[in-house]
């Protein structure tokens, strides 16, 4: 290319409103290109990645960094591969339940504060950096879950699939016993299925959460609910 033609095209290129320039494949930009970029105060970045890989990685990175986010009070655990957000008033037993779940082989994401980002319709929960791997248990204090139960007991992030809200048991409350009530919690515009768990002495809440996780997984694989099974059995008996 002739020198005058090249200079003219480079100047025209930089006449547009450009935030920055990224050169991939480790290519070396022409000195005239750099000179014109300095004149217009435009950043020129380089990467050894091929263009398609760079675009893919950059898109994922920006989707995470620019995603809408919020922080909720609660505990996030990974139970049988299902991300469960445990909510409820302070002192009701969220952290103690999480500790029991960890002892049973499940994993902690975060305790007390849950940072949540909405990425492409998914809710991704993580822990604030200062409390990663930490669990606060009343009467004991703060414990390092990683040190006590190993690296596999903590996971960095998890998609929230289910919300389990703890509340004190009330005899005058008609709690759902058939699993037919549909409750949802809105988080950053995404509706997440919500289960109300009444808490009182003697109830093994950790086992209940395990059952809820397995039941949720079952509901994803099957269109037939336990209520449907019971109705089918009743119809079969009535036909005899």
Residue ranges of predicted features:
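Short, structured interface segments
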Residues: 47-65
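Glycine-rich phosphate-binding P-loop
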Residues: 81-109
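Extracellular/luminal Protease-associated
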Residues: 1-38, 43-47
């Amino acid at each position: 290319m002739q020198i005058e033609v090249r200079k003219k095209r480079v100047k025209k290129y930089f006449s547009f409103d450009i935030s920055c320039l990224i050169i991939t494949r480790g290519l070396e930009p022409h000195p005239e290109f750099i000179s014109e970029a300095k004149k217009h105060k435009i950043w020129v970045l380089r990467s050894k990645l091929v263009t398609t890989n760079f675009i893919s990685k950059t898109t994922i990175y920006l989707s995470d960094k620019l995603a809408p986010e919020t922080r909720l009070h609660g505990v996030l655990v990974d139970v049988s591969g299902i991300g469960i957000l445990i909510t409820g008033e302070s002192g009701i037993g969220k952290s103690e339940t999480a500790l029991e779940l960890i002892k049973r082989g499940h994993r902690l994401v975060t305790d007390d504060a849950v940072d949540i980002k909405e990425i492409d319709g998914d809710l991704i929960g993580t822990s604030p950096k200062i409390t990663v791997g930490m669990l606060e248990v009343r009467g004991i204090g703060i414990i390092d879950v990683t040190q006590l139960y190993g690296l596999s007991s903590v996971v960095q992030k998890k998609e929230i699939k289910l919300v389990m809200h703890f509340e004190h048991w009330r005899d005058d409350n008609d709690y759902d016993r058939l699993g037919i009530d549909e409750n949802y919690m809105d988080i950053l515009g995404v509706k997440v299925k919500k289960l109300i768990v009444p808490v009182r002495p003697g109830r093994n809440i950790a086992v209940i959460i395990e059952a809820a996780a397995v039941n949720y997984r079952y509901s994803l694989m099957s269109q037939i609910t336990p209520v449907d099974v019971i109705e089918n059995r009743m119809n079969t008996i009535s036909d005899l």
